[in-house]
Amino acid sequence: MSLYHYFRPAQRSVFGDLMRDMAQMERQFTPVCRGSPSESSEIVNNDQKFAINLNVSQFKPEDLKINLDGHTLSIQGEQELKTEHGYSKKSFSRVILLPEDVDVGAVASNLSEDGKLSIEAPKKEAIQGRSIPIQQAPVEQKTSE
């Protein structure tokens, strides 16, 4: 007679309950996480521009901050909700290093009515190569004495 078979159904029941509870908790939190900036962002980097688009529909414009320090772009959102029944806080932060050929003086942002944050900057014009002529130094003449 083995005790292994005696305890095995109880073990299955405990882990089954645990897994079911974890799945239920995940289903409850999924709507909160859906649409967060981490899930829906797009970066465009081509010859004409650098752009990033984020879905920030869960944040008000006053909850968002965009900072530029050199070529480092920081995007932050923070929202707090206090009620008589509880407190909740949502936040996100993105730090993006802009390419060297981006015109950082022309970075602009736009927030659409449906909560799409768009940040764009044009690329600098490429410096055209040119030919540099070689100038010859004057030849010193030797004088004979």
Swiss-Prot record:
GO terms for cellular component: cytoplasm; Golgi medial cisterna; nucleus. GO terms for biological process: defense response to Gram-negative bacterium; endoplasmic reticulum unfolded protein response; IRE1-mediated unfolded protein response; protein refolding; response to heat. Pfam families: HSP20. The keyword Ribosomal protein does not apply. Disulfide bonds: none annotated. InterPro entries: A-crystallin/Hsp20_dom (IPR002068), Alpha-crystallin/HSP_16 (IPR055269), Alpha-crystallin/sHSP_animal (IPR001436), HSP20-like_chaperone (IPR008978). The keyword Cell inner membrane does not apply. Keywords: Stress response. Induction: By heat stress. Residues 32-137 form the sHSP domain. One of its GO terms (molecular function) is unfolded protein binding. Belongs to the small heat shock protein (HSP20) family. PANTHER family: HEAT SHOCK PROTEIN HSP-12.2-RELATED, HEAT SHOCK PROTEIN HSP-16.1_HSP-16.11-RELATED. This is Heat shock protein Hsp-16.1/Hsp-16.11. It comes from Caenorhabditis elegans.
